[in-house]
Each structure stands twice: as structure tokens, then as C-alpha cells.
Amino acid sequence: MDHKSPLVSWNLFGFDIVFNLSSILMILVTAFLVFLLAIICTRNLKKRPTGKQNFVEWIFDFVRGIIEGNMAWKKGGQFHFLAVTLILYIFIANMLGLPFSIVTKDHTLWWKSPTADATVTLTLSTTIILLTHFYGIKMRGTKQYLKGYVQPFWPLAIINVFEEFTSTLTLGLRLYGNIFAGEILLTLLAGLFFNEPAWGWIISIPGLIVWQAFSIFVGTIQAYIFIMLSMVYMSHKVADEH
């Protein structure tokens, strides 16, 4: 079944800018859940960590390992909180659309994973790529940063510039494609469960269980891949040579 998106447009200087209200809602829900998780897990910190504090420290150590695998900690340490926030945000965003969806009578979809929207994932990837340029210039200086585009010889500049666009697209669309495809199949299986007779239940229930588990795995892996590639791109820009 096709679902509609709750769209609103805003005219700015003669141009219509369209907003997807469900995506905005889910972005805010995800941000709130990340904030809530951080508050809950960091209350009453102790020198000897237990329970929730162990979980938080494991996340920080795991992300530190990703950063150190791509650049020296002396340079990469400043991106630690950024990477931790990103991996938590993307993981939670990937999970939100799995247990259920909220659809109104007119087939308007309100509850979904925000990462099932290409606009959201491409905005995330664009932000990351822009940050790599910002820190590349800040840490290496404009001259050294620009020299990286013409090394080892200047004709590569065209390829290097083109690579920036392809990196942005692949980083965002990979995340979107995997999450969107997973939710589409879950919707089809759920439709089979609710709309077909008993034989539909026999097929859909095992399928839903298996695909839910697989979608959790895919959502986790995609969060990891996004952070890994983000740190790879960052290391290419802040390294003395790339």
C-alpha cells in the first residue's frame, strides 16, 4: 500500500521549499531519545563503573577504536564526541521504524525511521563532508589543504573534486537505501498479516520475525559503516598527506 507524506511548503523569495513533517518529527524524536539515553546512562558516575556506565564506556572505547584505526589520536581525539553522538543518533534513527509505523486513515505516514528519507541521510552526509573540509583547512592551512587536490600531479584535481560529490552521495544513499528497503518489506509482510486470511498469517509471522532481526542487524551495521567512513574521510583531510 502506498503511503503519503505530510508535506508543507514555504515560499521563500519566490521559491517553494517543501518540508516533510513526519521526517522533522522523527528527527526530533531521535534527538530526544539520544539526549535521554545520555542523561540516564551518565547519572551517578562512579570510579568503578557498573551497568549503564559500563555500556557508555564501551561505546566510547568502541568509537575511539574506529578513530584510532584511521588517524592518530592526537588529531582524531577532537572528533570523539562527534562520532559517539553520530553513531548513537544513526543507530536509534535506524531502529525507530522497525517495531511499528503510524499511518492515518488517509494513508499519511507519520512514524518511520528518519533515515528512511533520502533528504535526511543526504543532509547528514553533506554535513559530514563539509566538516571534513572545515577541519582540513583549520588544521593544515588553506595552502596545504588545496595542495592535496593536485598531488601527486595536477590533472588529478578534477578527479579529486568529483570524488567529493560521489563520497557525499554514496555515504548518504547507502544508509537510505538499506533502511528504506527494510521498512518497505516489513510493510508488505505486515499488510499480508492484516489483510489476508489464515494462510497469510502462516507466511507473514515467521517472515516478520526473521526480517525484524535482520533489519536490526542491518541498522546496526549501517550506523557503524557511516561512522567508519566519516572518520576515513576526516582522516584524509586532516592528515599531513592524503
Curated annotation (Swiss-Prot):
Topology in the lipid bilayer:
Multi-pass membrane protein
From the Swiss-Prot or TrEMBL record, state where the protein is found: Cell membrane; Membrane raft
What InterPro entries is this protein classified in?
A: ATP_syn_F0_a_bact/chloroplast, ATP_synth_F0_asu, ATP_synth_F0_asu_AS, F0_ATP_A_sf
* Major subcellular location class: membrane
Which Gene3D superfamilies did the record assign? Answer: ATP synthase, F0 complex, subunit A (1.20.120.220)
What does the record list as GO biological process? proton motive force-driven plasma membrane ATP synthesis
- Protein name according to UniProt: ATP synthase subunit a
